[in-house]
């Protein structure tokens, strides 16, 4: 495309130069040596759109499209069966109804939920409130024992300082192997 435009421009300029030389000063165009012949007008093509087309460097959309395609696939793969399962549970099982509790019967913690899916989740994945209560009591007992031990340690340190029987009044003695008993030239060696 560019070669064709260049070829056309060269041919137009050559024809103009030849025609100006032949016409001479009669047309008032000027002489061939002064290079005053008219400018050539060649069409500039921009591929049919508005303005010059630029080569814009942009990142590839391959990974974005692949991610969206896979996300749609896996949503459909998991979403459709889940919707079908929830619909079947709502149609055939339905929500629980409130009834009188028989004498001496202690309901389980999941029996307080109305919907069967909530009951199933509470029964299989969550701990009961009694178990949570016992866990909290165990944590509180451990923390209270730690606090008591800290208080006892502070009291022991205070008494050791007051009576002077702490480790700061003792100096570590060197081991017997480190003592050099060989004769020395001066006492400080």
UniProtKB/Swiss-Prot annotation:
The chain crosses the membrane at residues 73-93. It is a single-pass membrane protein. GO terms for cellular component: mitochondrial inner membrane; mitochondrion; nucleoplasm; respiratory chain complex I. One of its GO terms (biological process) is aerobic respiration. Its main location: mitochondrion. Keywords: Electron transport, Membrane, Mitochondrion, Mitochondrion inner membrane, Respiratory chain, Transit peptide, Transmembrane, Transmembrane helix, Transport. It is found in: Mitochondrion inner membrane. Residues 1-46 form a transit peptide. Pfam families: NDUF_B5. Accessory subunit of the mitochondrial membrane respiratory chain NADH dehydrogenase (Complex I), that is believed not to be involved in catalysis. Complex I functions in the transfer of electrons from NADH to the respiratory chain. The immediate electron acceptor for the enzyme is believed to be ubiquinone. Complex I is composed of 45 different subunits. Belongs to the complex I NDUFB5 subunit family. This is NADH dehydrogenase [ubiquinone] 1 beta subcomplex subunit 5, mitochondrial. It comes from Mus musculus (Mouse).
């Amino acid at each position: 495309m560019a070669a064709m435009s260049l070829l056309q421009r060269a041919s137009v300029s050559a024809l103009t130069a030849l025609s100006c030389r032949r016409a001479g000063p009669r047309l008032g165009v000027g002489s061939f040596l002064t290079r005053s012949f008219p400018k050539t007008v060649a069409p500039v093509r921009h591929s049919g759109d508005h303005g010059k087309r630029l080569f814009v460097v942009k990142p590839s959309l391959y990974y974005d499209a692949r991610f969206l395609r896979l996300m749609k696939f896996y949503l459909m793969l998991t979403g459709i069966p889940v919707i079908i399962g929830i619909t079947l549970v709502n149609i055939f099982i339905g929500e629980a109804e409130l009834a009188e509790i028989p004498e001496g019967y202690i309901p389980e913690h999941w029996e307080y939920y109305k919907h069967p899916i909530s009951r199933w989740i509470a029964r299989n994945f969550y701990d009961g409130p009694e178990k949570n209560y016992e866990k909290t009591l165990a944590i509180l007992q451990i923390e209270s024992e730690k606090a008591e031990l800290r208080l006892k340690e502070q009291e022991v340190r205070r008494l050791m300082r007051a009576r002077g029987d702490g480790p700061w009044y003792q100096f570590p003695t060197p081991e017997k192997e480190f003592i050099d008993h060989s004769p020395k030239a001066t006492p400080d060696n």
